[in-house]
Amino acid sequence: FYKLKSYRYGYLPNQMRIFKITNKNRKNFLSYKDYLYLNGANGKYSKWLVDIVTTNKIFKNFKEDLTKIYYQMYIRDGKLKLIAFDKKLSDEEDAFFNFIKKQKSVLLMYTNYKMQYLIEYKNKNFYLNDEEITIESLKKFIFEEANTTRSLVLTENIVPSSKFKINGNEASLYLNVYNKNGLDPAIGEIYVKENSGYTTDQCDIAEEISDENIIESYKFKSYNKKKDSQESNDNSRIYFDEKTGKFRFFLVKRGDRVIKLKQTYKNEDLIKLIENNFEELNKKIIEIFKTVPQIEIAGVTICFTENGFKITNIHNNPEYCNATYFNKDYSNFLKYKYDTKRTLYKNVKYKINVFRKKLWLKLCRLFAKTCYPKGLVPYISFRWLRDIKNDFKENKNIPLKTKLWAYRHGFLSYRLPQYGITKENYKNFISDFEYKWLRHIDNYYKIWFEDKITIKYIASDYNKFFPKYYYFITLKQGENQIIPMMDCPKNLGNTYDDIIKLAKKEGDIALKRDKGSHGEGFYRLTYKNNKLYLNLKEATKDDIVNILSDKSNEYLVTEYIKQVDVLNNIYDGSVNTIRIIVFKKDGKTSTI
């Protein structure tokens, strides 16, 4: 009965015991089930934290604080491709293995963090996870692993400090970071967790426990047989105050009981290491997350080395706390996010839209599977018909017979005279349909190009070729929040008045939706002769505020690109762009 009751309340049974959950007080807590419901709280920006390559590019300004990536590996055309992340490194196979020899110890891991392997070179032999392996077998292993995932990376092997251990076992420091308004990131929880399970050494520690040192003790009944379940997590933990970094309590297990202790026992060196470095660590975490206001919640894993600390992972879904309560501010933030999501998903209009979207995608998949060659992205199936319809209506100078021939061979009819396509030479061309069928050539890493903010971070090394990004306006805590971005002048704040000041200073600035194309939702904000203009029409401050405060859209305030007179003479009503297609046949060499 107690087990069923726990599940009904949204907890695992032992969580109910630890937090003393009853029917009267359960609404005061954010349950484990509710916490899982918050997965994906970072929305479309969750993609920044699910792949080590993407994460390192987003946070490239802090590369010295992150795990260093040496190589990325993936399979293309049945062959293993090596991409060197450092220009000084060669991407030739022999050079790759010579580099491993030189480093002596490296990690081979999936880019999604799910698997990692230790590769060492010692005594003139290679070792994989401490087992000797020939270079031929190692090559085969890397090839087979690259075939099972989207890609692999070769990274540095971060060696922890001799002091960074719990009960003699290796440990990791975990931080839960949140940013409720996009401006003030903070640590919501901080603890060190033993990387392995309970040991004989720990049992000896448990024997030394005195009653006066016990803060609380919970009976821990095993309900789950799976070792990796949330409830059966057996690792010792040391919790710290998230504001000061001071030691709070030590969590150990003794028999069937989980015990909170005041005393640190044999872990004084680790405690001092964290406490002495907390101020620097907290400052660094705040500095990092201030640069990514789009990220609202993240888990950060840290390893302390002999030379400082390194961030080994930044991910979307921090672990639910099983031993102590979240602080009030962090708890309120999580509760607000939960309530907001529940309200949205209960909305009838939203439910109808979700149902319609799912039904549409299902129809697309069915239609694509039934009527098209295998491999077509489902939504293209209907778009291709739409393109044919538009082409049929618009190009009236092309005979009906010619149009039908073009459609049967995958071309839109206007392409025929444009490229001189005939019945004799059409096989020399890639048809419109074939090009659509190829989507998405970039596979997973197409996420880099899906919105304007992501590409700005990814390509920040070439910032001078991008418009300046001044502000990002997005919904936070129920209200639109104006968040200064990387190019915002230091003397400006984060109000609508500051955006007007920026327009007065620059003369022209651009207001555009973060996720949009074809100029939809674009405004040119101009200040001239003491008057404001939107798209060259006189406007008031209220007109501008009404656009930017629309909660249904995220807006970017950027530099307005003024084109040269030569292009302006062609058409001055918009920016006339030059489109360039770049491809990399070998995955490395860019070709126009």
Regions found by a protein language model. Give the residues of each.
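Intrinsically disordered, low-complexity linker/propeptide segments enriched in Ser/Thr/Gly/Pro
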Residues: 1, 6-12, 21, 95-100, ...
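Conserved N-proximal alpha/beta basic substrate-recognition cap immediately N-terminal to
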Residues: 1-99, 112-114, 366, 370-501, ...
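Domain-scale recognition of functional cores that engage charged ligands
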Residues: 45-53, 57-58, 72-95, 103-105, ...
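Short secondary-structure junctions
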Residues: 63-64, 291-296, 463-464, 552
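Hydrophobic residues on conserved beta-strands that form the core of alpha/beta folds
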Residues: 66, 154, 185, 297-299, ...
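Phosphate-binding site of ATP-dependent enzymes
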Residues: 101-104, 112, 130-251, 507, ...
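Conserved catalytic-core segments centered on acid/base and nucleophilic motifs
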Residues: 110, 176-177, 300-304, 310-312, ...
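C-terminal active-site "lid" helix and adjoining low-complexity regulatory extension at the edge
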Residues: 252-297, 304-376
